[in-house]
């Protein structure tokens, strides 16, 4: 008795029914592939008439701007090269192959135009054919291979980091001339719909142009499609890490002239600023394009700052030399007094304290009168004071007062007593040796104090001259810093307006 098998599950039947069309479609594509490539030769140009060219529609899509090497003058890009042409050998009727209208085949199986990058600097000139091409039943072939190109580009870093670059990419057939391949540009510029924004460069525009050139090597005319890539460097990174620190260093250099000379730290501040700038330059050397063709704008600014700081050190040393001058080492010329003590302070609205100027004549008059009195005291003969020999000009107030008293006293004594009494009284007025010695000592001290005050006044004048020089260079360096910075960084704007 036979074994009765149970009927297959419904799910199994449904799965088989679903796989039948897939298998049928795969079989149709297999038959179509065999039909298309049975006698196909990928070396022969796909034209029915040899005299006709193959029309190639060409477009470049920018995927990413990888890098711009300023030193080696190379631009690295990630591109998609869209190429569309018609191959009459790759036509079929969809009805014969279960409605199959499109088919993807390996690119090495079909004929392809040998379009290369003429100005390639490194790597392969031609794209890799590992990607597949899309075939349409009408014979239209669409091939979009991705490629990373390193193209040569003339980099002008004059206005770095505010520079604009124009890099060209020239595509064309290496083997086929105009009679064999006719290149047609799709659109008027590079396709940037799938562009991945770069952190350093911004693409302004990328127009494309078609050229026909006759080279020296050949008689034929060759076509090419050239894209001009206008790019602008994004300066934010360099502004924060290069320009702003240099501006701060320049500002510290200006403050050197505002620092008082008496503090003794002017040269220390100058040297510290110079050392900080030197270390800063060593750190950023690799950031700046190392080229000897032109001096980049940021290099000019760093050189300007270095000269700025060095010049401030030289001027500071000169100012300190003026500040510490004394009457024993230098004599102030008349023109220095006229220019630096009278003219320039008024021009720069500097006001010198008036107390010193008012007290100086009083001090000189006081010491002059006291020394005159001490000279009268030091006379050994009281008769000279009595007769008024040293006091005829009225400069000795003490002698004049003493002479009047002695004259009055002598007159009274004359009326009341004999001449011998008068001589006795006058003899008592003579100074003792101890008093004379004390007067000489006081006179010496007074003369020294007068000389010290005169020397201090001259030293104060030299210090004020140094202060005036400091103030002059303070304003000069502020103007140079502002105008120099503005002049350097306005050059890119002016150059862009000219172009």
UniProtKB/Swiss-Prot annotation:
GO biological process assignments: behavioral response to nicotine; excitatory postsynaptic potential; locomotory behavior; regulation of acetylcholine secretion, neurotransmission; regulation of dendrite morphogenesis; regulation of membrane potential; regulation of muscle contraction; regulation of smooth muscle contraction
Post-translational modification comment from the UniProt entry: Ubiquitinated; by STUB1/CHIP and thereafter degraded by the 26S proteosome complex.
InterPro entries: Neur_chan_lig-bd, Neur_chan_lig-bd_sf, Neur_channel, Neuro-gated_channel_TM_sf, Neuro_actylchol_rec, Neurotrans-gated_channel_TM, Neurotransmitter_ion_chnl_CS, Nicotinic_acetylcholine_rcpt
Keywords: Cell membrane, Disulfide bond, Endoplasmic reticulum, Glycoprotein, Golgi apparatus, Ion channel, Ion transport, Ligand-gated ion channel, Membrane, Metal-binding, Phosphoprotein, Receptor, Signal, Sodium, Synapse, Transmembrane, Transmembrane helix, Transport, Ubl conjugation
Residues annotated as signal peptide: 1-25
Transmembrane segments: 245-260, 263-279, 302-320, 469-487
Residues exposed to the Cytoplasmic side: 261-262, 321-468
Family according to the record: Belongs to the ligand-gated ion channel (TC 1.A.9) family. Acetylcholine receptor (TC 1.A.9.1) subfamily. Alpha-3/CHRNA3 sub-subfamily.
Function: Component of neuronal acetylcholine receptors (nAChRs) that function as pentameric, ligand-gated cation channels with high calcium permeability among other activities. nAChRs are excitatory neurotrasnmitter receptors formed by a collection of nAChR subunits known to mediate synaptic transmission in the nervous system and the neuromuscular junction. Each nAchR subunit confers differential attributes to channel properties, including activation, deactivation and desensitization kinetics, pH sensitivity, cation permeability, and binding to allosteric modulators.
The protein's name: Neuronal acetylcholine receptor subunit alpha-3
The encoding gene: Chrna3
